[in-house]
Amino acid sequence: NNAGWTHRNRPMLEVSEEEFDKVYAINMKSIYLSAIHAVPALRQAGGGSIINIASTAGLRPRPGLTWYNGSKGAVIITSKSMAAELGPDNIRVNCINPVFNPDTGLAAEFAGGPVDETRRAKFLATIPLGRFSTALDVANAALYLASDEAAFVSGVCIEVDGARCV
């Protein structure tokens, strides 16, 4: 489940109820709807793997994205809860927590405006490996979690973050 949305980076009390509802409808309800439709098929198949995309924001929140941060924290704990409940059905559930990627369509919302050099430098200074995540970084983590090599990996979140959450 790679559905995701955020409100513009700004003080929490300036986010409208409509924006709040959209963040939770996309970030959390998408997991519910995916599970409702996928779990019966995975049970019938004898098991499988569900991967939810959360965010480092659910572990190490930044100011200005309070409601987004909370929604991604909910994705993390929901993924762990699903792993515990669906394990007896041989269904593994994991999540991936990518760090900010300035090349996504939501980058300006996360940054609170255009991602100029000043904003890029501010974000980059918090990532010890010295670069942003890429779609390929996230895809590689998903490939591992979906593979037979991860057959005994369930209920974990992989931070694809260049050590930001350390």
Task: Go through the PLM ranges and name each one.
Residues 55:
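Residue(s) in the substrate-gating loop at a strand-loop-helix junction
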Residues 13, 60-66, 88, 130, ...:
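Active-site loop immediately N-terminal to the catalytic Tyr-X3-Lys motif
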Residues 35, 71, 79:
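Active-site helix of classical SDR
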Residues 95, 117-149, 153, 160-162:
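C-terminal helical subdomain
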Residues 6-9, 60, 142-143, 154-166:
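Short C-terminal tail/terminal secondary-structure segment
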Residues 40, 84-88, 151:
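Alpha-helical segment proximal to the catalytic Tyr-Lys
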